Amino acid sequence: MADINLAQLLDAGVHFGHKAYRWNPKMFPYIYTERNNIHILDLVQTAQLLKRANAYVQNAASEGKTFLFVGTKRQASAVIAQEAKRCPSGYYVNHRWLGGMLTNWVTLKSRIERLKTLEQQEVEGVFNLLPKKEASLRAKELEKLRKHLNGVKDMSKLPDVAIIIDQKREMTAIQECRKLGIPVISILDTNCDPDLVDIPIPGNDDAVRSIKLILNSLTNSIVQGCQ
């Protein structure tokens, strides 16, 4: 497990928080200073907590645990899919989180089965045999299901660990994880609540380079744990 050093965190802009007036006071212990009305995060703590998160996911992966990556914002969407696909036991949601994806698991499984059925029909040329209107409706349904469920299509059970980008945006996902007792690891910007996650990683959750650096580190640890 290769640790990320402070220079790498600094170079990726992980230390930049939000404007001071947007802060959550619970993030105070992780804030180093304030510059030009912008909170600056303490990268020493970020490095320590990232190391803890890496050890946790590596151990979980070695035990055969599964991971769900969640990040639907523009800056995170592509990286979430890219990193999750590197994990033998990784799944992802990188478009809209559908309420009940975890807490209403039976319904989600039925939607996944519908997605697989439509994909099979597409491969077998069934759409071409249908009336034009019906074929168009099924094609649109397939496109929509792929957009929202492609990353969890092969997830046969609830995930063991969730890795979430942007707590404020993904609050529904976090609440579902908490309700089900699924541990949450999350990059927390200065406007977040560390009490809602199991392992907080203080960091800039808006910059692509920051998100990519941290996710890549976590994924590397998962891959190592699977070996």
UniProtKB/Swiss-Prot annotation:
<dbReference type="GO" id="GO:0003735">
    <property type="term" value="F:structural constituent of ribosome"/>
</dbReference>
<dbReference type="InterPro" id="IPR018130">
    <property type="entry name" value="Ribosomal_uS2_CS"/>
</dbReference>
<dbReference type="InterPro" id="IPR001865">
    <property type="entry name" value="Ribosomal_uS2"/>
</dbReference>
<keyword id="KW-0689">Ribosomal protein</keyword>
<keyword id="KW-0687">Ribonucleoprotein</keyword>
<dbReference type="InterPro" id="IPR023591">
    <property type="entry name" value="Ribosomal_uS2_flav_dom_sf"/>
</dbReference>
<dbReference type="GO" id="GO:0005763">
    <property type="term" value="C:mitochondrial small ribosomal subunit"/>
</dbReference>
<comment type="similarity">
    <text>Belongs to the universal ribosomal protein uS2 family.</text>
</comment>
<dbReference type="GO" id="GO:0006412">
    <property type="term" value="P:translation"/>
</dbReference>
<keyword id="KW-0934">Plastid</keyword>
<dbReference type="InterPro" id="IPR005706">
    <property type="entry name" value="Ribosomal_uS2_bac/mit/plastid"/>
</dbReference>
<keyword id="KW-0150">Chloroplast</keyword>
<dbReference type="GO" id="GO:0009507">
    <property type="term" value="C:chloroplast"/>
</dbReference>
<protein>
    <recommendedName>
        <fullName>Small ribosomal subunit protein uS2c</fullName>
    </recommendedName>
</protein>
<dbReference type="Pfam" id="PF00318">
    <property type="entry name" value="Ribosomal_S2"/>
</dbReference>
